[in-house]
């Protein structure tokens, strides 16, 4: 296609909203003639399902729950007045709490103001807050923000070492809907120990975001934590960033959460349109459907040309893959749906994997994110007539053109600048696109049975570990290979898991297990140190 033809196609397919200062360009998705018209009946059905969801229909039948993350930025849309009031009052409480922390009315036990903020959560309880913090944070932050987002001891030690002596002025926010998420519980216990070792009272630094009546809620109440904010069962983790999960950390960091919500709210209004060409989320969903053949046949490579959007791909990995990656459709048919999402940032990726994107296996489509404003203030000319930002823009445009020249399709999303409003709009745009696409391919976007299966399997491993440690302690003079231990436990089918547990136990001194190394690793012998 000639450049002039591409320009006409660009004008024909471009969505631009002057109020949001947001554009969605699908001109480099090769929709065949009549594709949009052919998909229109399915889209109209998707719009109806989305409208019913927003009105309070049970959209997650597995758990008999409503799905209400859209109400978080438009409380008046909630189907019950009590829900509207709870959303409104929670936002007011978040803002009041953050203001009290910033003003020193809520302070560390020594009377000094809090300077640091440690967020403990995993999955949606970390990815959304991390994305918002990284994209909008800066030298003017009211609190320095840190995260425990895994159960990796070394990772937590690294964070604590960076906090250092500021621990005594660190506020801790523990985020878990059920209060029983093991990674988050472990992080809380590790943080508690760090505070106690420093001679500090953990509860005097702690805040919870959790479900009413949860184990965490009970702990916070019993120990008189500084505050408890709600997580509602009608908000899923991956769509919780505009709830207390994301708003409390952002407000404490000093981000304008009202503007974040305003951006999401404005985008929600645009994406409720049933006129497909005037609905940017629908255009995204159609692009995904065409590019992946509606069956996940291609991956989504996310290339934001902005360092502050580095974490956007991680955030979207969960939002898209956990929502769409399903074995069964809503009718119980085995479909193996999903879209794999990965990416880093431009122009770094041009010196990494773009070589394969242009000339290697064609199993992807690209989403470019363009931010027009380079920085606050004037830029240096790195050569006559060109700044570093000009180069970044040039590399984006060049990569887009080079890929399409080879038949590699792409979508480009453009915002004028990064701000709470534009970040809120991007969050809302993708939440709606995921919901519409799920309707198009007939999957439930609001449950995650595979995650639960993984949790159960992990629990079985920990139970088996307990049996192994007990066997070693009962027979301190006996050495076991992995195979011998599996037989001793009458679990011969679990020999590989037994071997991996023994190897891990011996590498750490916590359980008192030693190893005698043999020529073949699977013949290593393990015993209790007594």
Curated annotation (Swiss-Prot):
Give the molecular function GO annotations.
carbohydrate derivative binding; glucose-6-phosphate isomerase activity; monosaccharide binding
Write the Enzyme Commission number(s) for this entry: 5.3.1.9
Query: Which reaction(s) are listed as its catalytic activity?
Result: alpha-D-glucose 6-phosphate = beta-D-fructose 6-phosphate
PROSITE patterns for this protein: P_GLUCOSE_ISOMERASE_2, P_GLUCOSE_ISOMERASE_3
Cell compartments where the protein resides = Cytoplasm
UniProt keyword Transmembrane present: no
Pathway where it operates: Carbohydrate biosynthesis; gluconeogenesis; Carbohydrate degradation; glycolysis; D-glyceraldehyde 3-phosphate and glycerone phosphate from D-glucose: step 2/4
Q: Name one GO biological process term.
A: glycolytic process
Cellular component terms (Gene Ontology): cytosol
Group of enzyme by EC: isomerase
- Active site per the UniProt annotation: 322, 351, 455
Keyword terms: Cytoplasm, Gluconeogenesis, Glycolysis, Isomerase
What is the role of the protein in this entry? Catalyzes the reversible isomerization of glucose-6-phosphate to fructose-6-phosphate.
Family, per entry: Belongs to the GPI family.
Task: List the protein's name.
Answer: Glucose-6-phosphate isomerase
Identify the taxonomic lineage of the organism of origin.
Bacteria, Pseudomonadati, Thermodesulfobacteriota, Desulfuromonadia, Geobacterales
């Amino acid at each position: 296609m000639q450049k002039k033809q591409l320009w006409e196609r660009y004008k024909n397919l471009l969505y631009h909203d002057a109020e949001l200062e947001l554009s969605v360009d699908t001109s480099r998705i090769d929709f065949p003639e009549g594709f949009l018209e052919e998909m229109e009946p399915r889209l109209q059905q998707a719009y109806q399902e989305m409208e019913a969801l927003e009105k309070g229909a049970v959209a997650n039948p597995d758990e008999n729950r409503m799905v209400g993350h859209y109400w978080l930025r438009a409380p008046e849309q909630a189907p019950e007045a009590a829900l509207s009031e709870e959303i409104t009052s929670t936002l007011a409480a978040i803002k009041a709490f953050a203001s009290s922390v910033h003003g020193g009315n809520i302070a560390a036990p020594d009377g000094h103001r809090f300077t640091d903020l440690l967020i403990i959560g995993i999955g949606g309880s970390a990815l959304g807050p991390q994305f918002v913090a990284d994209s909008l944070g800066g030298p003017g932050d009211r609190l320095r923000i840190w995260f425990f987002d895994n159960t990796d001891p070394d990772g937590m030690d690294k964070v604590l070492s960076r906090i250092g002596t500021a621990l005594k002025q660190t506020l801790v926010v523990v985020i878990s809907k059920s209060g029983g998420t093991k990674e988050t519980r472990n992080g809380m216990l590790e943080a508690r120990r760090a505070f106690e070792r420093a001679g500090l009272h953990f509860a005097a630094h702690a805040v919870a975001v959790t479900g009413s009546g949860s184990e965490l809620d009970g702990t916070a109440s019993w120990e008189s934590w500084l505050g408890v904010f709600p997580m509602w069962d009608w908000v899923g983790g991956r769509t919780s960033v505009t709830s207390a999960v994301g708003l409390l950390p952002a407000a404490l960091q000093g981000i304008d959460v009202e503007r974040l919500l305003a951006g999401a709210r404005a985008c929600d209004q645009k994406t409720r349109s049933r006129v497909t060409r005037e609905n940017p989320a629908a255009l995204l969903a159609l692009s995904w459907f065409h590019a992946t053949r509606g069956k996940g046949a291609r991956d989504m490579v996310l290339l934001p040309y902005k360092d502050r959007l580095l974490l956007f791909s991680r955030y979207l990995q969960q939002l898209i893959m956990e929502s769409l990656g399903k074995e069964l459709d809503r009718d119980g048919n085995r479909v193996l749906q999903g879209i794999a999402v990965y990416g880093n940032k431009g122009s770094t990726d041009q010196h990494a994997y773009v070589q394969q994107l242009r000339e290697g296996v064609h199993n992807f489509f690209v989403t470019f994110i363009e931010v027009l404003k380079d920085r606050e203030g004037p830029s240096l000319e790195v050569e006559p007539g060109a700044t570093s930002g000009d180069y970044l823009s040039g590399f984006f445009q060049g990569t887009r053109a080079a890929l399409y020249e080879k038949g590699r399709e792409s979508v480009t999303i453009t915002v004028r600048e990064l701000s709470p409003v534009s970040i809120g709009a991007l969050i809302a745009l993708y939440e709606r696109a995921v919901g519409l696409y799920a309707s198009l391919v007939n999957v439930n976007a609001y449950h995650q049975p595979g995650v639960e299966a993984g949790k159960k399997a992990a629990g079985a491993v920990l139970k088996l570990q307990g049996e192994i440690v007990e066997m070693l302690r009962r027979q301190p003079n006996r050495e076991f290979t992995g195979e011998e231990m599996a037989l001793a436990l009458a679990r011969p089918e679990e020999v590989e898991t037994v071997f991996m547990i023994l190897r891990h136990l011996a590498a750490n001194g916590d359980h008192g297990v030693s190893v005698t190394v043999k020529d073949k690793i699977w013949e290593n012998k393990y015993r209790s140190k007594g």
